[in-house]
């Protein structure tokens, strides 16, 4: 096997933005593989009714698996790959710069990522782990005495420092654009996506950093911020966390919008339809996301007035999203020639997944329906369609775009990528589409057992996850030849 990717990681001390970007992608790949293997273990347990791998004495392991799966995939796979990898590699090029303004700060932000990852993963080996869920809701996170939760908190703080440094660097680079003949309104949607993501991170990260520190103080210094028996309020945690968490969904997928727009205009030999409206739609979505936080925890029953408000905000988010879908589909419809069929197939797969996830998101945006479906696997299917799979597809497209499949230096042929795309699509549909049907049953999430009559749908989901695993291993085999 070639070790070019590992060589690039060690040579990232050069401060070159492309090498740092590839190093980010390399880290994101291996972080993502660890998180994906955890999800395969979860699906293996759910393949049949009854407790098979997990026993009554080891139920905490199941809680630990889905907690770390969520944390790793959100903060160390998607954020590292899309914002760190694509942002560092592509952003200065799109602005006409040879590098970002502060290359050394860029390097420091890279070094914080593996530190945070090691802290989070090491929580597995500390006492009984930390099966709190990726949201770390109190009173569960404040009442458990094991030190694993503290390691998770500091690991997430390290990842937050990395994202903050990158955001400041990208915004400073954007405000320093002085290329001759370069007008702000002519900046590509891919560059704007990085800028908007940076602004969202700078607005939301201080809040979630504060709330994690408050949890730490509650655990060790009895500050009682979230302890209801001592004038604290656990709902306050949800308000503060989802001020970050709701924009975070858009933070993770926004660079994906930019790279899909860039690839469509590059490989279809067609200028992006509605380029300016695409930028305006991303900007409007970024702004509205900050005010729709209650959609993610409307089940605590705000009251009819606030429920109507958050339902309205969710519908407003869907409108510019529909505009982006229209622009992409129109660009594809008007193509005269295609340079890379494989890349175009992956972009079509991205659009299909996002349409499915967006449609189910409008359903969950209705407060009355969300009350019934919030704690079911319907939410799991929606979340993976609208965000996780789209983000992974964006990274795959970008890796093919820079002609370094999985950073080992292999050039993925058009025929091979055209074969991988439909297989990936089938595995995604098999894994997550049945969750919408079982969610209406309703099948609760975060539970390792279920009634026998739901065995068929869960087996199909496990089959799709197994197909994804085989596909990833096949790609590793190809690049090792």
Swiss-Prot record:
GO CC entries: mitochondrial inner membrane; respiratory chain complex IV
EC number: 7.1.1.9
Cofactor note: Binds 2 heme A groups non-covalently per subunit. Binds a copper B center.
Positions that bind Fe(II)-heme a: 69, 384
Subcellular location: Mitochondrion inner membrane
Cofactor(s) listed: heme; Cu cation
Cross-link (1'-histidyl-3'-tyrosine (His-Tyr)): 246-250
Protein name per the record: Cytochrome c oxidase subunit 1
The organism of origin for this protein: Theileria parva
């Amino acid at each position: 096997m070639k070790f070019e990717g590992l060589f690039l990681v060690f040579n990232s001390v050069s401060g070159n933005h492309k090498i740092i970007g590839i190093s980010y992608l390399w880290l994101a790949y291996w972080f993502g593989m660890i998180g994906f293997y955890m999800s395969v273990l979860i699906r293996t347990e759910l393949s049949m009714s009854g407790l098979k791998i997990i026993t009554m004495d080891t139920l905490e392991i199941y809680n630990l698996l889905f907690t770390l799966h969520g944390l790793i995939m959100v903060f160390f796979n998607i954020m590292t790959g899309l914002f760190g990898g694509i942002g560092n590699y592509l952003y200065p090029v799109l602005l006409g710069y040879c590098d970002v303004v502060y290359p050394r700060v860029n390097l420091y932000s890279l070094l914080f990522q593996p530190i945070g990852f090691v802290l989070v993963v090491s929580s597995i080996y500390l006492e009984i782990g930390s099966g709190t869920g990726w949201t770390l809701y109190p009173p569960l996170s404040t009442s458990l005495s094991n030190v694993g939760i503290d390691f998770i908190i500091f690991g997430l703080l390290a990842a937050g420092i990395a994202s903050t440094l990158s955001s400041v660097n990208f915004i400073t680079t954007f405000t320093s654009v002085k290329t001759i003949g370069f007008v702000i309104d002519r900046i590509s949607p891919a560059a704007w996506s990085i800028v908007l993501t940076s602004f969202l991170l700078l607005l939301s990260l201080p809040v979630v950093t504060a709330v994690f520190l408050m949890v730490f103080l509650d655990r060790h210094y009895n500050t009682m911020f979230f302890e209801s028996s001592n004038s604290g309020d656990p709902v306050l945690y949800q308000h503060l966390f989802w001020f970050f968490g709701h924009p975070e969904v858009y933070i993770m997928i926004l660079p994906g919008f930019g790279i899909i727009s860039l690839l469509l205009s590059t490989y279809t030999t067609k200028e992006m339809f509605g380029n300016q409206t695409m930028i305006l739609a991303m900007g409007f979505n970024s702004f509205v996301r900050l005010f729709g936080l209650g959609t993610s925890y409307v089940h605590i029953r705000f009251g009819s007035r606030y429920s109507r408000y958050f339902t309205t905000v969710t519908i407003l988010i869907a409108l510019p999203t529909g505009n982006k879908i229209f622009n992409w589909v129109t660009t594809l419809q008007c193509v005269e020639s295609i340079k890379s069929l494989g890349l175009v197939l992956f972009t079509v797969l991205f659009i299909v997944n996002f349409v499915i996830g967006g449609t189910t998101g409008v359903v969950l945006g209705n407060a009355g329906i969300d009350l019934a479906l919030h704690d079911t696997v319907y939410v799991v299917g929606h979340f993976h369609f609208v965000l996780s799979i789209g983000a992974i597809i964006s990274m795959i497209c970008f890796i093919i775009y820079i002609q370094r499949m999985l950073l080992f230096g292999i050039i993925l042929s058009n025929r091979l990528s055209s074969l991988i795309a439909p297989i990936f699509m089938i595995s995604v549909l098999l894994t997550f589409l049945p969750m919408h049907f079982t969610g209406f049953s309703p099948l609760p999430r975060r539970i390792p057992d279920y009634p026998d009559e739901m065995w068929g749908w869960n087996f199909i989901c496990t089959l799709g996850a197994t197909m994804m695993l085989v596909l990833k291993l096949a790609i590793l085999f190809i690049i090792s030849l």
